[in-house]
From Swiss-Prot:
Name assigned to this protein: 5-methyltetrahydropteroyltriglutamate--homocysteine methyltransferase
Membrane-spanning ranges: none
GO MF: 5-methyltetrahydropteroyltriglutamate-homocysteine S-methyltransferase activity; zinc ion binding
One Pfam family linked to the record: Meth_synt_1
Length: 754
């Protein structure tokens, strides 16, 4: 019995990669220094995985920004606008990631989307010229040879041709048709080069196979691989899937020329049933994904061994594997000195999951009952308390009307128009303002008890004053307090709710250099005291203009935390919804007229198969949001915000959230959502983000005016709000002020024309 992992976190034990790249962005280090830091990390990770006794060690899973972009660059799928900048390869790569504004030109970044049902974001490759598609990159070969120098025969990992093709945004059908042929030739050349290097195994990741596949999808997959697998020669190919099961294509895969199939037994609801129904091919190896790559709880060896025993009825050729990349979990529990051992023993981050794979291999390869098995089973005895009877009773007492807001949207809109007295095309921001070093230092000093609560509060109040003043000077219509007290929109609420646990160093990559530290939902959730009330009241006292109350919604708190596995996601979400509802009502009672409840991650846990959307998710996720705001008066305006997902196919459900205003990311996706909003007669007022805050470039007044005009061509002027596409926390003040001034100027200019 051997073991394997799909891929490993690349940010490093202490986010070394993030800091190395950011230094390069700030011109504080050279290209050579950045590449050396990256190589050092790769070597450290390979040695760590090797030391843990993993048999199939991945290479090419490392990335300076995003592995989808890496695959696109490998095959020269780079839009002409980036080629025309005439930058070197590294800076062209980062121009695609972040946009570019300088002496060589001014271009926006590639669109960013959620990676399937995770909180990782990938960059959408753009292809406007298929003629240039070819194997021009060498990253996959270089990194294989780096590992080889360490004495490691690695398994290069690459996004498969079918998934990559499905993720690319093509200019038109003609380009797409040519790209199909060119990309196939490029993959064939890749196979040839890997054969020249005498590579043993290549892992091709095809997560797109876990979606609902059409006949056309299956035909395309077969067309690609019937040709491609004829060119594998001595190279062994592992087809790796994750985030679901392969029900639409599994029987065909058994007949294919793949040497191994990687199946997910955590999220793949039908993976075991498919094997029980169709068996497994004698000429293939089963890479069994039984270590959860998306959650942090320790593996129960009894359950894993039971699964292996069942699988062995159908094949003896089994490799123990992770269910998906370990990118989605933190690096190691080694760095958690503050978390009580009664909790910590039940957690397994990436490094600990390597140990779990090693243990399981050893247990399966030994004849008598192994002490490793007994030690694992001991973990699950005497678990700390999780239940709160008051929370259970409150959930039980909920009635149908608790999930419905009255009066109707139409009636509320008239009442709010009279009450709020906002101009046409009201301008606002999404919530957070830049967090400078002194803001972070103040928060850290307070956490470490180096300053008093009074000093901490006074510092933040001064920052709020400055933030309100800046917004008033710019001329925004609806203000925010800036969120200087918050480290992260989910972690902050978790810290102030009962039922959550926190790590010191549990960082996970969200995109590029952005890392998040998800809280852990351990027990029943409740609010013991107001969370944002004092900050919102203080901010509102500073201005005659409306200052929004800012909250994070229950679905996002759930989706951006590591969830419990002992109760349903529905129950966890409703517990959080009741806690946030209490906060909403406190804000309203304090005179806060607009309350924003962000649901940035609404789409994240939406099942990948449409047949499961409602029964497994939307039927409880949308009502949970309704529960949060259903108790407010008609005159109180409820906003929500969503970002970096595809919403076109769930807009009716989003409308059913019954918010009064929704803002969403639209700038990177070229406002393509607006046509759908128009088509379904979306009732909610909308703020399609008019510029991309994830890029350092400052949009001009002309550019913003054109964007606003585009929006006005699609939607009624009474329905539109003008705002950036996301919070401004990660940007510098000079970029923010310049961009917002241009936003207000452009809006005023357009108002004069209406």
């Amino acid at each position: 019995m051997k073991n394997s992992i799909i891929s490993y976190p690349r940010i490093g034990a202490n986010r070394e990669l993030k800091f190395a790249i950011e230094k390069y962005f700030k011109n504080q280090s050279s290209k050579e220094e950045l590449l050396k830091s990256a190589k050092d990390l790769r070597i450290r990770h390979w040695q760590e995985i090797q030391k843990a006794g993993i048999d199939f060690i991945p290479s090419n899973d490392f990335s300076l920004y995003d592995n989808v972009l890496d695959a696109a660059v490998l095959f020269n799928i780079v839009h002409t606008k980036y080629k025309n900048l005439n930058l070197d390869a590294l800076d062209e790569y980062f121009a695609q990631s972040r946009g570019y504004q300088g002496e060589n030109g001014d271009v926006t970044a590639l669109a960013m989307k959620k990676w399937f049902n995770t909180n990782y974001h990938y960059l959408v490759p753009e292809c406007d010229n298929a003629d240039i598609i070819a194997l021009t990159g060498d990253k996959i070969f270089k990194e294989y040879l780096e590992a080889k120098e360490l004495g490691i025969e690695s398994k290069p990992v690459l996004i498969g041709i079918f998934t990559l093709f499905k993720l690319i945004a093509f200019k038109d059908e003609k380009t797409q048709k040519l790209a199909k042929e060119k990309l196939l030739n490029a993959y064939i050349e890749l196979f040839d080069k890997l054969n020249e290097l005498k590579v043993t195994w290549l892992e091709l990741d095809e997560p797109y196979l876990v979606y609902d596949l059409s006949k056309e999808d299956i035909a395309l997959f077969e067309e690609f691989y019937q040709e491609l697998l004829n060119h594998k020669k001595d190279l062994k190919i592992l087809l790796q899937s994750y985030f679901g099961d392969l029900r639409d294509i599994y029987p065909k895969l058994l007949e294919s020329k793949f040497d191994a199939l990687g199946l997910d037994f955590i999220e793949g609801k039908q993976s075991l049933a498919l094997i029980q129904k169709y068996g497994f091919a004698k000429d293939k190896i089963l890479f069994a994904g039984l270590i959860n790559g998306k959650n942090i709880y320790a593996n129960d060896y009894a359950k894993s061994l039971k699964l292996i025993k069942e699988l062995q009825k159908y094949t003896q050729n089994i490799v123990l594997n992770t269910s998906c990349s370990l990118l989605h979990v933190p690096y190691s529990t080694e760095f958690e000195s503050k978390l009580d051992s009664s909790y910590l023993k039940l957690f397994a981050f990436a490094k600990e999951k390597l140990q779990e794979l090693k243990d399981l291999k050893e247990i399966l390869n030994s004849s008598e009952e192994n002490p490793l098995f007994r030690a694992n089973q001991e973990l699950f005895k005497n678990i700390p308390e999780r239940l709160d009877e008051k929370v259970k009773a409150r959930l039980k007492a909920l009635k149908k009307e608790d999930f419905t807001r009255t009066p109707s949207f139409k009636e509320r809109a008239l009442i709010q128009k009279e009450f709020l007295k906002l101009p046409l095309l009201p301008t606002t921001t999404i919530g957070s303002f830049p967090q400078s070093t002194d803001v972070r230092s103040n928060r850290l000093a307070f956490k470490q008890e180096k300053i008093s609560a009074q000093n901490y509060t006074e510092f933040n109040q001064q920052k709020i004053k400055e933030c309100i003043q800046i917004q008033e000077e710019i001329g925004l219509d609806v203000l925010v307090h800036g969120e200087f007290e918050r480290n992260d929109m989910v972690e902050y609420f978790g810290e102030n709710l009962k039922g959550f646990l926190f790590t010191q160093n549990g960082w996970v990559q969200s995109y590029g250099t952005r890392c998040v530290k998800p809280p852990v939902i351990w027990g029943d959730v409740s609010r013991t005291k107001p969370i944002t009330l004092a900050w919102s009241k203080f901010a509102q006292s500073l201005s005659q203009k409306i200052v929004k109350g800012m909250l994070t919604g229950p679905v996002t708190i759930l989706n951006w935390s590591f969830p419990r596995e002992d109760i349903s996601l529905k129950e966890s979400t409703e517990q959080i919804a009741l806690a946030i509802r209490d906060e909403v009502l406190d804000l309203e009672n304090a005179g806060i007229k607009i309350i924003q409840i962000d649901e940035a991650a609404l789409r994240e846990k939406l099942p990948l198969r449409k047949s499961d959307w409602h029964s497994e998710y939307l039927d409880w996720a949308i009502p949970a949001f309704n529960l949060v705001h259903s108790g407010v008066k008609a005159k109180t305006q409820i906003h929500t915000h969503m970002c970096y997902s595809e919403f076109g196919d769930i807009l009716k459900e989003i409308d059913a959230m019954d918010a009064d205003v929704i803002s969403f990311e639209a700038s990177r996706s070229n406002l393509s959502l607006l046509d759908t909003l128009k088509a379904i007669r979306f009732k909610t007022e909308v703020g399609p983000g008019v510029y991309d805050i994830h890029s350092p470039r400052v949009p001009s007044v002309e550019e913003l005016s054109l964007t606003i005009e585009k929006i006005l061509n699609k939607l009624p002027k009474e329905q539109i709000w003008i705002n950036p596409d996301c919070g401004l926390k990660t940007r510098a003040y000079e970029e923010v002020i310049a961009s917002l001034k241009n936003l207000v100027t452009a809006t005023q200019k357009i108002r004069e024309q209406l």
